[in-house]
């Protein structure tokens, strides 16, 4: 999660680091760096499928072009006088849609928040696209000619001073890397990895600003700080990545210890599809007898430090991870059980998301991509009972090819203390931050949920997946669910309202976002809308009791899994830093691509109920629209 935490806690997390709450709870306080004053402004535009289909009739195609070439032609025709580069993370999703991402440049230097994403349909034509390209006046001179900007060491000092980062630059020295104007700093302390800097432009207030993008991983935050290239104590914007065998465990679908008892589960990867070809304890080269494999390395981390490889993990030569737990035990007494539970939950979610399309090419978290594309070497590092905090959790999501990092904390809200590793909804929420940060804007760009409304949707997606997965067979659309209630020991959970289709129980509509300035509150609104989407699709298609979906013509046959698939596919279509309206359109477009639009009216019924009706146009102020499309 961008922090599962309660409302004041979340804003402090880093780029990709996500944390939990929304309702205030005694004993909880903000941790880390508050990046809200430094968030990028929203600039993305999105052309949904219907508008794109009408527009591209005049677009020149060649049957000999591949999908990347077609996408490139669209960008060139849209902005013929601009320069850009193709990001090396294009792929074809499981729904047959090709995804290509471009980065705008000026004088060969990236404009870091200027992106163009093109989605190509099965017919080879442009399906949808979005962009945030800068259209203002370009710098007339190449800054690399005069080099009248500060060196990267000064930028590092500026970021540390302005943001009060716990990094000591001491005798920092900038060492050049292979990529132009990119440096790694030696001689620092306080960060979990060596800080980095890269010279980039950003667009802000209608102008381009040359900046040093300073990257610092300080645990609770993994930041990209855009420091002015001349006035190095001026930080323009900040992005945070931290947005965190036999097994005796709480089985998939049990959210927490109040819903059932631990049971024995044998070789669970046999029931979770093709996402783990090496099982959960191998990576194609090594076989492990601990809670480590191709997808996940789960261990304790009582010190809260950045070292993980040699930390304690349960070990069993027979792969029998069977440990005791009862509610009277303190967390350190059931450490083995907690690590095993975390390993089980994250691996199962990995495999489920794989079936929906979060594959190697899409930027998932795996050590060995088995020749299927993507960067690899980036399994998720999952720390149980992490000592760096309490009463929260977070997940850091750097770009594809770098490890995701989850940190699960104990909760001092009850006696004995409770362990977030045992509340599956918290774990799923956190891992979903990795999903959304890798899919939105492409796997090579983890900066695409950095604006306030987009970051709120990142929180909402986490709650949505956590809630969808915990549904029971006898639930109905009248069933309500809370978030974090067990771990926080808080009746009603950590969100302002429970998730409910009842407008009296949860009255949120899109207009409520207008007065919000914190991602968890915004996320609760988004997840509320998606909860209505979920139940509309379940009412249409039913709900399977199986862990993995059954696919018919590429689409899950039941409503719960169809909702999760469409939400995931929507992430791949929408532009970098989307708003609610663009996300709505992307989900509608995802259904068009997957089912030829069979669920359009069920989807729009949910969106319009909560204020995102068919005639809503995103403007300066958020005012509800409850209209339904004429063909519904």
Swiss-Prot record:
<dbReference type="InterPro" id="IPR001842">
    <property type="entry name" value="Peptidase_M36"/>
</dbReference>
<protein>
    <recommendedName>
        <fullName>Extracellular metalloproteinase 2</fullName>
        <ecNumber>3.4.24.-</ecNumber>
    </recommendedName>
</protein>
<keyword id="KW-0732">Signal</keyword>
<comment type="function">
    <text>Secreted metalloproteinase probably acting as a virulence factor.</text>
</comment>
<feature type="binding site">
    <location>
        <position position="429"/>
    </location>
    <ligand>
        <name>Zn(2+)</name>
    </ligand>
</feature>
<dbReference type="GO" id="GO:0005576">
    <property type="term" value="C:extracellular region"/>
</dbReference>
<dbReference type="GO" id="GO:0008270">
    <property type="term" value="F:zinc ion binding"/>
</dbReference>
<dbReference type="Pfam" id="PF07504">
    <property type="entry name" value="FTP"/>
</dbReference>
<keyword id="KW-0479">Metal-binding</keyword>
<feature type="signal peptide">
    <location>
        <begin position="1"/>
        <end position="19"/>
    </location>
</feature>
<keyword id="KW-0378">Hydrolase</keyword>
<dbReference type="InterPro" id="IPR050371">
    <property type="entry name" value="Fungal_virulence_M36"/>
</dbReference>
<comment type="similarity">
    <text>Belongs to the peptidase M36 family.</text>
</comment>
<keyword id="KW-0843">Virulence</keyword>
<keyword id="KW-0862">Zinc</keyword>
<feature type="active site">
    <location>
        <position position="430"/>
    </location>
</feature>
<dbReference type="GO" id="GO:0004222">
    <property type="term" value="F:metalloendopeptidase activity"/>
</dbReference>
<feature type="glycosylation site" description="N-linked (GlcNAc...) asparagine">
    <location>
        <position position="270"/>
    </location>
</feature>
<keyword id="KW-0645">Protease</keyword>
<keyword id="KW-0964">Secreted</keyword>
<dbReference type="Pfam" id="PF02128">
    <property type="entry name" value="Peptidase_M36"/>
</dbReference>
<keyword id="KW-0482">Metalloprotease</keyword>
<dbReference type="InterPro" id="IPR027268">
    <property type="entry name" value="Peptidase_M4/M1_CTD_sf"/>
</dbReference>
<feature type="propeptide">
    <location>
        <begin position="20"/>
        <end position="244"/>
    </location>
</feature>
<feature type="binding site">
    <location>
        <position position="433"/>
    </location>
    <ligand>
        <name>Zn(2+)</name>
    </ligand>
</feature>
<keyword id="KW-0865">Zymogen</keyword>
<dbReference type="InterPro" id="IPR011096">
    <property type="entry name" value="FTP_domain"/>
</dbReference>
<keyword id="KW-0325">Glycoprotein</keyword>
<dbReference type="GO" id="GO:0006508">
    <property type="term" value="P:proteolysis"/>
</dbReference>
């Amino acid at each position: 999660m961008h922090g599962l935490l309660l409302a004041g806690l979340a804003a402090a997390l880093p780029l990709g680091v996500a944390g939990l709450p929304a309702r205030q709870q005694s004993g909880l306080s903000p941790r880390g760096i508050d990046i809200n004053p430094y968030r990028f402004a929203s600039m993305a535009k999105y052309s949904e499928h219907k508008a794109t289909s009408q527009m591209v009739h005049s677009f020149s195609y060649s049957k000999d072009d591949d999908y990347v070439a077609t996408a490139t032609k669209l960008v060139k025709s849209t902005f013929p006088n601009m320069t850009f580069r193709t990001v090396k993370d294009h792929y074809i999703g499981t729904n047959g849609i090709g995804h290509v991402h471009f980065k705008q440049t000026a004088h060969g230097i990236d404009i870091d928040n200027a992106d163009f994403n093109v989605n190509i349909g099965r017919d080879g034509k442009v399906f949808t696209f979005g962009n945030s390209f800068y259209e203002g006046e370009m710098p007339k001179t190449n800054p690399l000619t005069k080099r009248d900007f500060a060196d990267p060491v000064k930028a590092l000092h500026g970021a540390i001073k302005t943001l009060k980062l716990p990094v000591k630059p001491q005798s920092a020295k900038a060492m050049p890397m292979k990529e132009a104007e990119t440096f790694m700093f030696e001689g620092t302390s306080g960060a979990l990895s060596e800080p980095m800097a890269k010279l980039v432009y950003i667009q802000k207030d209608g102008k381009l600003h040359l900046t040093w993008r300073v990257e610092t991983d300080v645990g609770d935050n993994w930041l990209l700080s855009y420091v002015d290239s001349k006035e190095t104590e001026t930080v323009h914007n900040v992005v945070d990545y931290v947005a965190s065998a036999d097994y005796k465990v709480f089985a998939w679908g049990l959210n927490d210890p109040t819903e059932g008892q631990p049971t024995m589960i044998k070789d669970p990867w046999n029931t979770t599809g093709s996402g783990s070809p090496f099982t959960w304890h191998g990576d194609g080269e090594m076989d492990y007898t601990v809670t480590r494999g191709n997808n996940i390395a789960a261990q304790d981390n009582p010190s809260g430090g950045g070292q993980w490889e040699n930390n304690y993990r349960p070990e069993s030569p027979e792969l029998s991870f069977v440990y005791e737990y009862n509610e009277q035990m303190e967390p350190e007494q059931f450490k083995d059980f907690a690590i095993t539970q975390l390993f089980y939950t994250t691996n199962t979610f990995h495999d489920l998301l794989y079936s929906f399309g979060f594959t190697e090419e899409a930027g998932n978290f795996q050590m060995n991509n088995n020749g299927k594309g993507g960067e690899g070497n980036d399994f998720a590092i999952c720390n149980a009972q992490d000592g760096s905090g309490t009463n929260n959790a977070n997940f850091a999501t750097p770009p594809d090819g770098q490890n995701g990092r989850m940190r699960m904390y104990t909760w001092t809200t009850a006696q004995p203390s409770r362990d977030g590793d045992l509340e599956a909804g918290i774990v799923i929420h956190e891992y979903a931050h990795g999903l959304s940060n890798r899919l939105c804007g492409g796997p090579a760009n983890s900066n695409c949920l950095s604006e306030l409304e987009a970051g709120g949707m990142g929180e909402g997606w986490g709650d949505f997946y956590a809630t969808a997965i915990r549904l029971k067979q006898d639930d109905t659309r009248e069933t309500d669910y809370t978030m974090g209630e067990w771990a926080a020991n808080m009746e009603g959970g950590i969100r302002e309202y429970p998730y409910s289709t009842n407008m009296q129980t949860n009255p949120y509509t899109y207009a409520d976002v207008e007065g919000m300035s914190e991602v968890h509150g915004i996320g609760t609104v988004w997840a509320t809308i998606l909860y209505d989407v979920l139940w509309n699709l379940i009412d249409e298609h039913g709900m399977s009791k199986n862990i993995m979906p059954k696919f018919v013509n590429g689409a899950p046959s039941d409503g719960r899994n169809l909702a999760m698939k469409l939400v995931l596919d929507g992430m791949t279509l929408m532009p970098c830093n989307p708003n609610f309206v663009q996300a709505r359109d992307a989900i509608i477009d995802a259904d068009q691509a997957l089912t030829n639009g069979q669920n359009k009216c069920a989807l729009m019924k949910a969106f319009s109920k909560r204020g995102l009706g068919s005639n809503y146009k995103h403007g300066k102020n958020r005012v509800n629209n409850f209209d339904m499309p004429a063909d519904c």
